[in-house]
Amino acid sequence: MQKIEAVIQPSKLDAVKDALVEIGVEGMTILEARGHGRQKGHTEFYRGREYSVDLLPKVKLELVVKDEMVEQAVQAIITAARTGTIGDGKIFVSKIDEAIRIRNDERGEIAL
């Protein structure tokens, strides 16, 4: 099992969710987040005053999938989230040692 964490633009959330459901991903956690990468935010004007917006709104998706589904899930996220501009986001993949369903103590892939 592997955990996929993707930080994407909020406007791409529905497309990414739909793409993941289409390939058979049954569960995911979605969090609102703020952050910046290389784009470092931007400058805006309000009532004639300039101010800096350093932390931009993002969405973080977390999902755990079977090893054989990792590449398909990653490609689904990339295809659905890509705009081709700075700030499209990042994907992180890491190994999961164990998954446990709290309700009935099921363990391993069956708990997904």
Write out the residue ranges for each language-model feature.
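Positively charged, small/polar-rich N-terminal and surface patches that mediate targeting and assembly
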Residues: 1-112
